[in-house]
Amino acid sequence: FSYTQSIKWLTFNEALEAQKIKPKKIIMDVYTEWCGPCKMMDKNTFANRDVLNYINENFYAVKFNGEGNEKINFFDQEFTNPEFIDRRKGRNSTHQLTKFLQVDVYPTIIFFSEEGDPIIPVKGYLNPREIELYLKLIKKGDYFAFRSEDDFEKYKKYFRPKFRN
């Protein structure tokens, strides 16, 4: 068994195409260039061996700049960033897909089903043990059983993380 050193990041278009060949859920990291917590997640969470191995084995991983200029084809629509300014320092205009997915906090992790449908957004910084809960919850499909916020809180309370922080 060999360990890779990093997550195999794809573009969203690549992940959606890969799903047609081999269905897998998608984890999308919506970030920006200026976001401090996003950089911390790259350094502490996505570089964690337990996290990266679990993601590489079970998901298509997408890194998406919420203020970038990538052209995305999703739900039979084309999403772009018409007001994007190249080489701009700091904040840029918000990508149409970012708005469509209702992302208003960076970082936001969005999980998608094998069919490409959004499942859940998770807002803010997550350490390895915090993201583990969501990775396993989504991978196993346990979220289907939740009928309320209380159900999720119970799940969280009894969840025992195995990843090292």
Model-derived segments and spans:
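Non-globular targeting/processing and membrane-anchoring segments
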Residues: 4-7, 102, 113, 119-165
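Thiol-based oxidoreductase modules, predominantly thioredoxin-like and allied folds used
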Residues: 6-9, 48-89
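A short beta-strand-turn-helix
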Residues: 8-26, 55
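Extracellular/periplasmic catalytic domains that process cell-envelope and extracellular macromolecules
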Residues: 20-21, 53-56, 101-105
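Short active-site neighborhood of thiol/selenol oxidoreductases, capturing the structured segment around
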Residues: 22-36, 61
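A short, hydrophobic beta-strand/beta-hairpin element that forms part of a small beta-sheet core
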Residues: 27, 61, 96-100, 105-122
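Solvent-exposed coil/turn segments that connect beta secondary-structure elements
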Residues: 33, 66-67, 115, 127
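Detector for the c-type heme attachment site
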Residues: 39-43
